[in-house]
Amino acid sequence: MGAILRQSGKRRNVQTFFISIGARYKRIRKRPRGVPSPQLYEYKVEKLQELEKQACEGRIRLYYADESHTCTEGYAPYGWQLRGEDVYIPSQRVARLNIFGMIDRDNRYKGFTTSEKMTADKIVSFLDEISFNLKMDTFVVLDNASVHRNKKIRELRPIWKQRGLFLFYLPPYSPQLNIAEILWRILKGKWMRPQDYITSDMLFYTTIELWRI
């Protein structure tokens, strides 16, 4: 009985402590996968706004980076069609061109394309090369994809910081914060024409040439 009373006393002490600091005893809520923590989201947005301000003042360079691809299967956008009209995009799943690109709010772009699989090694090599040619501190905004958080990137981040290259990770499941997502939608929905998907040669040529404009 004495042991039970001692345990009960401990529970009351714990309750008293939490009540004293303003805590409430309530059921812990479940959060569906794919929804970022509100606290983390707010913190990251605040930090990103600070970086945006510094970039506008010319104190840093701020890029938003992401991967995408074009393929001969084609991209099917929305469009007006007359009744009985057969509007289509030529489609064949033969070739794919992967893209890693970075863009800032002044539309300065850096990136590369490859017909091979987009790997962490390729991204690391690209970022490492950039780190040698910086004129000011440069921040690259990334999502949390595994290729952005691999071991090699973790090992090189301290070295890149010394060269003036910094990585900023968005909160999970927040593509709306990455303006590179807009770039891909424009690429596939406006810049690429239906005839650009007919052959792999035309697809690759058009995609690469668009980045040179």
Give residue ranges: language-model regions.
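Short functional hotspots at interaction and active-site rims
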Residues: M1-I213
